[in-house]
Design a protein with these regions (language model features):
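An N-terminally biased module of ancient metal coordination in phosphate/nucleic-acid-related enzymes
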Residues: 1-76, 156-159, 164, 170-171, ...
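Low-complexity, compositionally biased segments
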Residues: 9, 18, 44, 81, ...
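Extended substrate/RNA-proximal surfaces in nucleic-acid metabolism proteins
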Residues: 52-208, 267-287, 294-296
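C-terminal appended segment following the main domain
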Residues: 222-296
Length: 296
């Protein structure tokens, strides 16, 4: 059996439904050789999972997924930080700011959904998930109120409401610099979702991002059609960018429907670990942060 990995998952600390322990246990059940917990705008899930993964013998790659903006590009981009020191003071400070910013943007989105005839509030989303009032929390608040039949119906509504929401406060260049300062690598998540004139990003787009310090792209993703995967894998090779992959598992509406469904070879981990080792030669996985005190 070829060892496989998953470098993109979510827990209850963002839009996921599983605890860090549950997602780690499922990774072990699947026989994964490495896992990254990459919650939106915060690393609570990854930090909580460090000790659990170490005790249970799983390589846990420290991770986070920032919502960022890129000047000249309309819409929000998701930027993965992998291998970084999640206890870094700069990371912790920006986490707090980014979480506040995101909740304000979700409240704005709820306002637009209300205008569209789906009366929803950020407080109702908090009632679903007090840790992170995100897209899935809003969707299930709508289901609970009988506004929609299921959470998947909300996907269409978001395509109408979310583009009206102001951009994320965190600039991609600053986020890349932050990740590097914490000893990690910066990877654009699911690049096939970002378009210019309805076309995939080109070599020029990735060259511009690499000039800002981008380290890699997520060319393996469960929603990525094979032609797009080939496109981005080719661009990554031409640009000397790392290739990563993940299921983007959230656990909604129930269970782990995506982890392990599409094997992601762990050979992709080699380049990532080599890059992190160059940035943080004194560190090795799994990182021991037990001396840093309780999570806050």
């Amino acid at each position: 059996m070829i060892p496989v990995i998953d470098l993109h998952t979510h827990t209850i600390y963002s839009d996921g439904r599983a605890t860090p322990a549950e997602i780690i246990d499922h990774a072990l059940h699947l026989g994964l050789s490495a896992l990254a917990i990459t919650d939106h705008n915060n690393s609570r899930g990854a930090r909580e999972g460090e000790g659990i993964a170490r005790e249970r013998g799983l390589l846990l790659i420290p991770g986070i997924e920032w919502y960022v903006n890129w000047e000249g590009y309309e819409g929000t981009i998701d930027l993965l930080g992998l291998g970084l020191d999640l206890w870094d003071a700069g990371v912790r400070r920006v986490e707090e700011e980014a979480l506040v910013d995101f909740e304000e943007r979700m409240a704005e989105c709820c306002g637009y959904l209300t205008e569209m005839g789906y009366p929803l509030s950020i407080d109702e989303a908090r009632a679903i998930n007090p840790r992170f009032a995100g897209h899935n929390a809003v969707a299930f608040a709508a289901v609970r109120k009988g506004l929609i039949a299921d959470s998947e119906e909300m996907d269409h509504l978001y395509t109408l409401a979310w583009p009206r929401v102001r951009p994320a406060m965190l600039d991609i260049a600053i986020a890349i610099e932050l990740i590097h300062a914490a000893g990690g690598v910066a990877v654009v998540a699911h690049p096939h979702q970002y378009k210019r004139d309805d076309e995939n990003w080109s070599l020029e787009d990735l060259a511009a991002l690499k000039a800002l310090g981008l380290d890699g792209i997520e060319a393996y993703h469960r929603r990525m059609p094979p032609p797009d995967r080939a496109h981005f894998a080719r661009l990554a090779e031409e640009m000397d960018l790392l290739i990563t992959g993940g299921s983007d598992e959230h656990g909604w509406p129930a269970g782990f429907r995506h982890m392990g469904k599409e094997p992601i070879p762990d050979v992709l981990l080699n380049g990532l670990l080599a890059r992190v080792a160059a940035l943080r030669p004194s560190s090795a996985f799994p990182l021991d942060r037990s001396e840093r005190g309780p999570l806050t």
